[in-house]
């Protein structure tokens, strides 16, 4: 009982968690609204009047867009008015899959964790870069040369991917078809983490999903993209002296250049290459890796964001130097280095947030997008108020002995040395003298007896079954029993047969991914989720043990 005139009663659950009414946000010309939304909650944004864009892609008037787990900014060139409100909460299944992600709504408009209006933005600089690239494209069309090949460099969380989206969106808006290359294995572009991808963009990008979506069996309001995917199951490009990453980059560049030679629109538009921030940290081998990328993609323009030191180094090494293009001598094609300002909206994304991003990308690959989207519903034939793309992966049990499963055997100081897996120890293992490991013992035995051959039916690693010229590829074939560490990890299916050489497996593009739900080491069976039905094709499979690593909670 409360005193008269004082409302001291306990608030009900409905009253406590009732969503706040939508807020009206007015932006003046040349300003942007920056917002952060936690995983597990959604925020709806509607353009009431004026014009606005998110990373270069225009918002449709009177359409409601739903955002979840993002840090973004909506910019306006001429002024606009936005309506921001709280969206529907994600179901308990998706929320538990976030593994402890922050799901509490913030105190900003619509439940944003953080939101504010900024008057100072680098959008004018970015627009000038777009116009300069467009001038180069017009010259390429007139002279028959290749279009600009742009490399974006900068430290972590400097806005490199955001700039890539802006330049791509502006190019597609005027009918161009740029090829976008993602060289950052930490985040997937139209794919899962741990991949290097290249995609030709002819149509608009998705406001809610960033780059958009790749082909799937469900409906899509925005035209899907067709990515070329290579698997690099490590977080750092410089792992193992960078030899694996360097080889995959070369193969990806060869495919991109082949596409440009056959596609006139892509050749005139050029390419945009997004890079990982670790290459800008002055670590051993980083400058050599940048030089490898510049050479392989015949880069003509280097954009440096948020690093004076890196900009100075790039100016000394590349500015006004001839490109590696075959036509550079005849056309006097030279490299330009440009410094760009870092946006004040760039915020640090901690390890916990990036883990949620990776888990969300993997979950979306197998189960679709759980976020209800009214924008997609408005473009669909049905009259439902909200819609979400729900996919149903196919579960099946595989015989481990029938799989050609490989793993990259690269030592790392960051790897957990205390990891213990009893399934890895079999009858052939022994306690080696002096603390030597299997690799050291095997190497010493080969030195003593180079002509020694393994026993029939026993292959210790893939290197012993291939010519010596390919033995430098650190791929090792997994032998029975099935390691229990396979559970809750990804498997990448390549396009080459299981008997392919290590270099062929490393350089092969990816057909699709499997998720290992359970491992039965005693019976030699593994239970997997596949995006399509039918038998798993007899192809070489690469284990993503180290990256993206273990993904717990994807299935019950």
Curated annotation (Swiss-Prot):
It comes from Aspergillus terreus (strain NIH 2624 / FGSC A1156). Residues 1-21, 414-458 are annotated as: Disordered. Gene3D superfamilies: Clp1, DNA binding domain, P-loop containing nucleotide triphosphate hydrolases, Pre-mRNA cleavage complex subunit Clp1, C-terminal domain. The gene is clp1. The keyword Nucleus applies. One of its GO terms (cellular component) is mRNA cleavage factor complex. One of its GO terms (molecular function) is ATP binding. ATP binds at residues 32, 71, 157-162. It comes from the Eukaryota. This is mRNA cleavage and polyadenylation factor clp1. Belongs to the Clp1 family. Clp1 subfamily.
């Amino acid at each position: 009982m409360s005193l008269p005139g004082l409302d001291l009663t306990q608030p009900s659950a409905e009253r406590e968690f009732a969503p706040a009414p939508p807020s009206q946000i007015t932006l003046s010309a040349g300003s942007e609204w920056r917002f952060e939304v936690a995983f597990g909650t959604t925020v709806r944004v509607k353009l009431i009047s004026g014009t606005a864009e998110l990373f270069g892609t225009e918002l449709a008037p009177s359409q409601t867009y739903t955002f979840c787990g993002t840090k973004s900014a909506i910019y306006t060139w001429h002024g606009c008015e936005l309506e921001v409100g709280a969206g529907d909460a994600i179901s308990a299944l998706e929320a538990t899959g976030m593994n402890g992600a922050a799901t509490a709504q913030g105190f900003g408009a619509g439940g944003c964790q953080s939101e504010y209006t900024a008057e100072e933005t680098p959008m004018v600089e970015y627009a000038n870069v777009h116009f300069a690239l467009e001038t180069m494209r017009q010259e390429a069309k007139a002279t028959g040369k290749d279009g600009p090949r742009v490399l974006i460099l900068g430290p972590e969380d400097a806005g490199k991917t955001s700039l890539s989206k802006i330049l791509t969106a502006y190019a597609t808006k005027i009918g161009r078809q740029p090829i976008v290359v993602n060289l950052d294995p930490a985040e997937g572009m139209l794919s899962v983490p741990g991949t290097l991808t290249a995609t030709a963009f002819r149509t608009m990008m998705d406001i809610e999903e960033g780059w958009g979506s790749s082909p799937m069996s469900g409906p899509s309001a925005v035209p899907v993209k067709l990515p070329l995917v290579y698997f690099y199951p490590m977080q750092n490009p410089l792992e193992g002296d960078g030899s694996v990453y360097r080889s995959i980059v070369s193969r990806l560049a060869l495919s991109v250049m082949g596409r440009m030679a056959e596609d006139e629109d892509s050749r005139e538009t050029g390419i945009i290459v997004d890079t990982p921030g670790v290459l800008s940290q002055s670590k051993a081998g980083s400058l050599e890796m940048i030089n490898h990328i510049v050479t392989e993609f015949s880069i003509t323009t280097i954009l440096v964001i948020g690093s004076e030191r890196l900009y100075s180094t790039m100016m000394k090494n590349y500015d006004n130097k001839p490109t590696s293009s075959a036509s550079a001598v005849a056309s006097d094609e030279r490299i330009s280095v440009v410094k760009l300002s870092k946006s004040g909206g760039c915020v640090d994304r901690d390890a916990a947030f990036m883990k949620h991003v990776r888990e969300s990308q993997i979950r979306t690959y197998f189960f679709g997008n759980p976020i209800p989207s009214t924008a997609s519903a408005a473009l669909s034939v049905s009259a439902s108020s909200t819609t979400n793309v729900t996919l149903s992966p196919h579960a099946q049990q595989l015989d481990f002995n029938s799989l050609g499963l490989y793993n990259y055997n690269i030592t790392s100081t960051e790897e957990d040395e205390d990891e213990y897996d009893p399934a890895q120890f079999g009858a052939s293992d022994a306690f080696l003298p002096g603390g030597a490991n299997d690799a050291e013992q095997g190497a010493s035995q080969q030195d003593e007896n180079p002509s020694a051959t393994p026993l029939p039916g026993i292959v210790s690693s893939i290197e012993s079954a291939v010519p010596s010229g390919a033995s430098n590829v650190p791929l090792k074939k997994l032998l029975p029993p099935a390691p229990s560490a396979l559970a809750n990890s990804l498997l990448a299916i390549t396009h080459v047969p299981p008997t392919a050489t290590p270099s062929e497996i490393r350089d092969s593009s990816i057909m699709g991914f499997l998720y290992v739900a359970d491992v039965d080491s005693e019976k030699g069976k593994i239970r997997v989720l596949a995006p399509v039905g039918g038998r798993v094709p007899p192809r070489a499979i690469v284990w993503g043990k180290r990256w993206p690593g273990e993904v717990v909670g994807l299935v019950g």
